[in-house]
Amino acid sequence: MRRCRACGSPRLLYHSELYDLSIAHIDCDAFYASVEKRDNPELADKPVIVGGGKRGVVSTACYIARIHGVRSAMPMFKALEACPDAVVIKPDMEKYSRVGREIRTMMQELTPLVQPLSIDEAFLDLSGTEKLHHDPPARVLAKFTGRVEKEVGVSVSAGLSYCKFLAKVASDLQKPRGFSVVGEAEALSFLAARPVTTIWGVGKAFAATLEADGIRMIAQLQEMEESELMRRYGVMGQRLFRLARGIDERHVHNNDPVKSVSSETTFFHDISRHEDLVPILRSLSEKVAWRLKKSGIAGQTVVLKMKTADFKSRTRNRRLDDPTQLADRIFRTGLALLEKETDGTKFRLIGIGVSDLRDAGLADPPDLVDRQATRRAAAEAAMDKLRDKFGKGSVETGYTFRTRK
């Protein structure tokens, strides 16, 4: 690697493996905020925060806001303390999803092997695409980043390597508008100089465990035997051993299944009364059920998520006898879990979802014992038909109607 003779930039000019690498990670830069700035040029030089009201959290902060210390998932009141002049914009997920799909389509023009991680990032396997594009993957990727900014109006950062782990690490190196490469020959030395939090799965809690054992840098992991790491940290020890050496044999898949479907909301004021939480839970359950039905899937485990006024999270779950995509079953299962949590505690957030997803053909067999459940399922099916014909807000249950009072 060498620096530019004209400006001295350390950004890559030459790499011995540049035309041999084919695994890419694409990540849009401050995506939600970038879309808002694209649609309103007056925001170009202003700090922009996309997120909820004062009681919500930051979804995305533009790079100007980040200079002031604003970060994703930061409570909004703290973000505004750090950057009081920020322009706060309520998230428009429909718009972001639309832009994300546009970029995804452009990715799929490069290769059929596109593995989305979210609406604004994905892995791409560009192996074997040279004949199609008449260019090696590195050039194809560089052209792609420029095309996205020109045609869509948002910038992206790209990482190119020989494996998924290092491609993702590389895409974070020079944001925004980054294009970074990590080759196989340099992987060990590149990783050795980085903290253990670079490794997937090493969050704050596990990093603290490693630090208690005197391990802060990946170089220290590289000096340890796999057996010793597994003795100390179990299966995670094997991951530490392999990723610390740049060993990642996972392939890019374009059909990774969705693992869960959920919906949550943050309250404007803390809520402690059970009767006030019930209609909100019902409304969220209907949103989850609607998404399941539209996707042709069902979930067998219902998950209740709550966050207390002091930001402590609670997660409860219950496995059903068979998969469901009915709002009524999701709600009633969640309600049983909720009843054990409403003891006067003040909550700032509630969410409901399902995991352990299955094909919808296995969902909700007739209940031969509870005839009322069968009637409720029939009523829900009738409401679904009305919503399909007249819109989602055309018919509501008594529970959800109470939330609009």
From Swiss-Prot:
GO terms for cellular component: cytosol. Its main location: cytoplasm. GO terms for molecular function: damaged DNA binding; DNA-directed DNA polymerase activity; magnesium ion binding. The keyword Cell division does not apply. Mg(2+) binds at D27, D120. The record marks Y32 as: Substrate discrimination. It is found in: Cytoplasm. One of its GO terms (biological process) is DNA-templated DNA replication. CDD domains: PolY_Pol_IV_kappa. Residues 23-203 form the UmuC domain. Its cofactor is Mg(2+). It catalyses: DNA(n) + a 2'-deoxyribonucleoside 5'-triphosphate = DNA(n+1) + diphosphate. Poorly processive, error-prone DNA polymerase involved in untargeted mutagenesis. Copies undamaged DNA at stalled replication forks, which arise in vivo from mismatched or misaligned primer ends. These misaligned primers can be extended by PolIV. Exhibits no 3'-5' exonuclease (proofreading) activity. May be involved in translesional synthesis, in conjunction with the beta clamp from PolIII. Belongs to the DNA polymerase type-Y family. This is DNA polymerase IV 1. The lineage of its organism: Bacteria, Pseudomonadati, Pseudomonadota, Alphaproteobacteria, Hyphomicrobiales. The gene is dinB1.
